[in-house]
Amino acid sequence: MDIRQLHYFLVLCDEMNYSRAAQRLFLSRQALRQSISALEAELCGPLFLSAHHKLTLTDRGMSLQRHAAPVVEQFQQMQAALHAEIQSAQPVRIGISVSLAV
């Protein structure tokens, strides 16, 4: 399980539709399905039930959603903070006196 899979899972929870979630993530439906299937295999059970082309979360899926949402949010905040620090960093300039250069 990695942060990317958790992000994909949360987007699918928001959309409750593979096609819309894949489009939002700029992925193919197949790639999204593979990622969710790998997550389900790692967690030893389904995260979603599909009936009449409608997705619903299983109990396991609801539990993962509760735990994954703050983790992904904190990760995204960390990325934004680090990116801001990198953007605000100033180059270091070193000057050498002529007498020291000789």
Q: Where would I find each of the regions flagged by the language model?
A:
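The N-cap/first-turn positions of alpha helices
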Residues: 2-8, 29, 61, 68
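Short helix-boundary/capping micro-motifs
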Residues: 12-28
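Residue cluster at the C-terminal edge of the helix-turn-helix DNA-binding motif
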Residues: 15, 24, 37-46
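Alpha-helical DNA-recognition elements
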Residues: 27, 38, 77
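N-terminal winged-helix
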Residues: 29-30, 34, 80-81, 87-102
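A short LG(V/I)-centered, amphipathic sequence patch enriched
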Residues: 40-57, 62
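Alpha-helical linker/hinge and terminal dimerization helices associated
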Residues: 42-43, 64-86
